[in-house]
Amino acid sequence: MTQPLFLIGPRGCGKTTVGMALADSLNRRFVDTDQWLQSQLNMTVAEIVEREEWAGFRARETAALEAVTAASTVIATGGGIILTEFNRHFMQNNGIVVYLCAPVSVLVNRLQAAPEEDLRPTLTGKPLSEEVQEVLEERDALYREVAHIIIDATNEPSQVISEIRSALAQTINC
């Protein structure tokens, strides 16, 4: 199987952490769309949003998704990538989409433990726990709609990777 694997889910679900280790275990290339975009523009996500607002960032995010999609690649996407209908169809039609699902409490704890998350612009201007709750309520149905595989991401990364590999084996052998 050489199809790209798209990891989707909210901030803090482990897309980058799991993605790097999953790519290594599958002997694949790893790309994070936010990191790729930041390196191309030499700007942080917050700087891009400040300069181009969210609409401009979302357009660049779509271009990044198309640019990094390649065979034998694990792609960690931005949490809002599913907000654009084109992106949802693109991922569904060009690879296997894995939703890393976790409850609000886990996401908030992870985000509070990661100081680099302070570099991310707020989506709602609300306190973190309220923002995560609101954003997840808005996006969960979209994550589920686009996903070929849904994985409980509350476990340790090694367990999440094992579950993804098992689900991939079942998907391929159907």
From Swiss-Prot:
Cofactor binding, per record: Binds 1 Mg(2+) ion per subunit.
Q: What is the annotated localization of this protein?
A: Cytoplasm
Catalysed reaction per UniProt? Answer: shikimate + ATP = 3-phosphoshikimate + ADP + H(+)
What Pfam families is this protein classified in? SKI
Provide the alphabetized UniProt keywords: Amino-acid biosynthesis, Aromatic amino acid biosynthesis, ATP-binding, Cytoplasm, Kinase, Magnesium, Metal-binding, Nucleotide-binding, Transferase
In the UniProt record, does the keyword Metal-binding occur?
yes
GO terms in the biological process aspect are: amino acid biosynthetic process; aromatic amino acid family biosynthetic process; chorismate biosynthetic process
Which residues bind Mg(2+) per the record? 16, 32
List the Gene Ontology MF annotations in alphabetical order: ATP binding; magnesium ion binding; shikimate kinase activity
Q: Which cofactor does it need?
A: Mg(2+)
Q: Where is this region: LID domain?
A: 112-126
EC supergroup of this enzyme: transferase
Q: Using the UniProt record, give the first listed, main subcellular location.
A: cytoplasm
Q: Which GO terms describe its cellular component?
A: cytosol
Q: What does this protein do?
A: Catalyzes the specific phosphorylation of the 3-hydroxyl group of shikimic acid using ATP as a cosubstrate.
Quaternary context: Monomer.
Entry note about domains = The LID domain closes over the active site upon ATP binding.
Q: Which protein, by its recorded name, is this?
A: Shikimate kinase 2
